[in-house]
Design a protein with these regions (language model features):
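PLP-dependent amino-acid enzyme catalytic core
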Residues: 1-496
């Protein structure tokens, strides 16, 4: 079963090739047109362990790999790496359920996929007979960078460069990245916001591929962002895990719908929920929760995507995005029309906006609902959830919780609700403290200790240990400097 570019049906790739390439040659994303037609036993999947679920789901989405191969890759990726054996536990909070995706090695939801991607990529290299070194380029709004470097750290045959917006991530997120160890990791701040960094990374891919700038040099580029299908596919697993937990608790019977509320920036996490739905999981409504950068809220409500608007730096920086790359995959999968998608993406590049046809808008609105939440209300929500339920959530989760309540008010006949919690509150301790009515004092580590004293909830060990780690990465670049920087690093034999 081949993947194809969202912009050109003639550009196809096997799942292994799609993982290695990251982006299609024309700048489109790889998608599986026959996703809904896969023969997948979703009910049996609910009876398996989390690793068993991952094996079945990834075999369905990445058919180049045998069941035995995938089983080994999943075991290597997840065994002993997370706080709990089920990787992503669910917690009843009030009348809703919180899906905790931050129990991995970097305390963010990206760990689920980025623990898996290096193993998939290494296996894909062997399947495709590729001897070149893989150079991973990744733009991050905060969490992807650290999780990607943690996953690829000292993996043979790979190097990774992470670009983050200078001043656009939390102090803890920055500390996680600039102290990253490993001989094959590199981090650079980019002057501008996340969209600037992400657009520049895509331009590097296009320039290097279009002009063969690395031809014959033993290096090929790939991505660890959710534009890479190998990054996106593992995220489908926790939708099944959450549903199985609700069945086990008696919240739903098998076959009854569940609504999922997802804090959304680049549209990858919520798109994984759509994939789960296409595989048969009884997903009701996928609720897209945005912060003040509410371009997706407006799009889902109106069918018009318009990035020509103010960009806000918020307390939920992983959602500070105006160009949501994975939305392109959804447009392709719902329309089946790669020419339409190519036209819309051209309009976005040239005009900064596009509008989808009415029929496509109605399809989107039949599956998705959207709401947004500003910074002040985010912090009030943190305090309210703590006071009412004694549950401590980070800023992104607070946005999702707030939008979940909006959704339930607007839709009284809603199904049971699962709120995805994407990061530990200790990654954003100052904002969380403000939400609890306290003033943050001192550096990020002192603030973490302050939050621990106030709540009695211990900070993750991986975050506490940052204080002792030396800063290794200090590069700051303009966007125009990124291509020469990548070409130079690609040719360096040793980085450290």
């Amino acid at each position: 079963m081949n993947y194809q570019s969202t912009r050109n049906a003639a550009l196809t790739a096997s799942s292994a090739e799609a993982i290695l390439n990251g982006l299609a040659p024309d700048g489109g994303l790889y998608a599986m047109p026959a996703l809904a037609g896969l023969d997948f036993d979703w009910q049996r999947c609910l009876t398996l362990s989390t690793q068993g679920m991952a094996t079945e789901i990834l075999c369905a989405l990445l058919p180049d790999f045998t069941h035995a191969e995938m089983e080994q890759l999943v075991h290597a990726a997840y065994t002993g790496k997370f706080e709990t054996e089920d990787l992503t536990p669910t917690v009843p909070v009030g009348e809703d359920t919180v899906l905790e995706l931050f129990r991995g090695p970097t305390s963010a939801f990206k760990d689920v996929a980025l623990s898996m991607l290096p193993h998939l990529m290494t296996a894909a290299k062997k399947k495709c007979g590729v001897d070149d070194e893989i150079l991973i380029l990744t733009a991050t709004s905060g969490d992807t960078g650290k999780a990607a470097m943690e996953g690829f750290c000292d993996v043979a045959g790979t190097k990774i460069i992470v670009f983050y917006p200078d001043g656009g991530v939390s102090a803890v997120q920055k500390a996680q990245m600039v102290t990253q160890g490993g001989d094959n990791t590199c981090v650079a701040a980019v002057r501008g916001n996340f969209d600037d960094a992400q657009t520049a990374v895509k331009q590097v891919f296009a320039k290097v591929g279009g002009e063969d700038l690395l031809a014959g040099k033993g290096v090929r580029l790939s991505s660890a962002n959710s534009i890479n299908i190998g990054r996106l596919a593992p995220q489908v697993v926790y939708y099944f895990r959450a549903y199985a937990d609700l069945v086990r608790r008696g919240t739903v019977a098998v076959g009854e719908r569940v609504d999922y509320v997802v804090p959304t920036g680049n549209f990858g996490d919520i798109l994984a929920g759509y994939f789960a739905r296409e595989l048969g999981l009884p997903v009701g409504t996928l609720v897209c929760a945005s912060n003040a950068n509410n371009v997706l809220t407006d799009f889902i409500r109106t069918g018009r995507y318009d990035k020509k608007r103010p960009f806000y730096l918020t307390s939920s920086p992983s959602m500070d995005i105006l160009v949501s790359s994975n939305l392109e995959r959804l447009l392709f999968l719902l329309s089946g029309d790669e020419q339409l998608v190519a036209k819309l993406m051209r309009q976005l590049t040239e005009d900064g906006a596009y509008e989808v046809p009415e029929e496509l808008k109605e399809k989107i609105q039949s599956i998705f609902w959207a709401g947004c939440c500003g910074d002040d209300e985010t912090k009030r929500t943190i305090g309210r959830v703590w006071q009412e339920h004694h549950y401590l959530c980070d800023t992104h989760t607070a946005v999702a919780w707030n939008v979940a309540q909006q959704y339930k008010t607007a839709n009284p006949a809603h199904a049971p609700v699962v709120v995805l919690s994407t990061a530990s509150p200790y990654k954003f301790p100052a904002a969380v403290l403000e939400g609890l009515g306290e003033k943050a004092e001192g550096d990020e580590f002192a603030v973490m200790e302050q939050l621990e004293r106030l709540t009695g909830i211990p900070a993750p060990k991986n975050l506490c240990g940052l204080r002792e780690r030396p800063v290794r990465h200090t590069t700051v670049l303009d966007r125009e400097e990124m291509l020469p920087f990548v070409l130079e690093k690609a040719q360096e034999k040793k980085w450290f």
